[in-house]
From Swiss-Prot:
Phylogenetic lineage: Bacteria, Pseudomonadati, Pseudomonadota, Gammaproteobacteria, Enterobacterales
Listed name of the protein: Holliday junction branch migration complex subunit RuvB
Matching CDD domains: AAA (cd00009)
Enzyme class: hydrolase
Record note on quaternary structure: Homohexamer. Forms an RuvA(8)-RuvB(12)-Holliday junction (HJ) complex. HJ DNA is sandwiched between 2 RuvA tetramers; dsDNA enters through RuvA and exits via RuvB. An RuvB hexamer assembles on each DNA strand where it exits the tetramer. Each RuvB hexamer is contacted by two RuvA subunits (via domain III) on 2 adjacent RuvB subunits; this complex drives branch migration. In the full resolvosome a probable DNA-RuvA(4)-RuvB(12)-RuvC(2) complex forms which resolves the HJ.
One Pfam match: RuvB_C
Length: 336
């Protein structure tokens, strides 16, 4: 199973990236959710503008699909500067990064997605650029090689990552601002779904937006993807208007249940409950039981189930929680 094949995957496709650009908020005033992040960034941005400085370097981390790229765009818009975008895997050589840095205007924002995937060679070039606004470049090879320094304009580096723990300490320590994005609350997702529906010219009730939000796994990217599929269903099977009933019918047809679980989530939980009496069960046995790789279970299926309290990791293996039993209407066994 490939994560990108799942309707409730938090990863983005190229087509979705293009479609989502039109409905992304442009300013902090339009930004929904993440209240602590929003209030802090308002102060940091206003203070930088009052001083006439570039904003401090910013690290944004958290699960995929929560709006790290959106926040980077908002920062650039609020500061009134250009945004240059790249990603860690694209910057293969030091010269790739040097080319981007030397083309920045004063106070511009350089956004590096997946910054945890920077190569050590590129990362070494980034240190003096972040700290001293200087670029150290080696000219020539062998005994004739020499280092030259190029002054850079003050700029803001925004790094985004889903794996903050994978960053090296020297890189992490050079960010003056660090923001963690959390999963969204249902009321905030409902607001996002309603806003997206209006941008798409859809007729959607508040209850319809709520139904989509409940099944979106706390993730705006998933909410917008589900909204597009509900729109398709409403246009073909009904008159295009989206009520709670129509949204529920569409999502049930797509095998996304009330908790936002898809077929694979339910298959894993039911395997633990039915085949292993609720667990504990070892990872290898569980992988064999559902026909998946253990890495798929660890990296793709488990995290959300554990976070939502449906699955436990114990020293003896995986166990279904009482909440998992109740989700399927099965009476949990008596605790000894």
């Amino acid at each position: 199973m490939i994560e990108a094949d799942r309707l409730i995957s938090a990863g983005a496709t190229i087509a979705e990236d293009v479609a989502d650009r039109a409905i992304r908020p442009k300013l902090l005033a339009e930004y929904v959710g993440q209240p602590q992040v929003r209030s802090q960034m308002e102060i940091f941005i206003q203070a930088a503008k009052l001083r006439g400085d570039a904003l401090d370097h910013l690290l944004i981390f958290g699960p995929p699909g929560l709006g790290k790229t959106t926040l980077a765009n908002i920062v650039a818009n609020e500061m009134g500067v250009n945004l240059r975008t790249t990603s860690g895997p694209v910057l293969e050589k030091a010269g790739d990064l040097a080319a981007m840095l030397t083309n920045l205007e004063p106070h511009d924002v350089l956004f590096i997605d997946e910054i945890h995937r920077l190569s050590p060679v590129v990362e070494e070039v980034l240190y003096p650029a972040m700290e001293d606004y200087q670029l150290d470049i080696m000219i020539g090879e062998g005994p004739a090689a020499r280092s030259i320094k190029i002054d850079l304009p003050p700029f803001t580096l925004i790094g985004a990552t889903t794996r903050a723990g994978s960053l090296t300490s020297p890189l992490r320590d050079r960010f003056g601002i660090v923001q963690r994005l959390e999963f969204y609350q249902v009321p905030d997702l409902q607001h996002i779904v309603g806003r997206s529906a209006r941008h798409m010219g859809l007729e959607m009730s508040d209850d319809g937006a709520l139904e989509v939000a409940r099944r979106a796994r706390g993730t705006p990217r998933i909410a917008n993807r589900l909204l597009r599929r509900v729109r398709d269903f409403a246009e073909v099977k009904h008159d295009g208007a989206i009520s709670a009933e129509i949204a529920a019918q569409a999502l049930d047809m797509l095998n996304v249940d009330a908790e936002g679980f898809d077929y694979m989530d339910r298959k894993l939980l039911l395997a633990v409950i039915d085949k292993f009496f609720g667990g504990p069960v070892g990872l290898d046995n569980l992988a064999a039981a559902i026909g998946e790789e253990r890495e798929t279970i660890e990296d793709v299926l488990e995290p959300y189930l554990i976070q939502q309290g449906f699955l436990q990791r114990t020293p003896r293996g995986r166990m279904a929680t009482v909440r998992a039993w109740n989700h399927f209407g099965i009476t949990p066994p008596e605790m000894p």
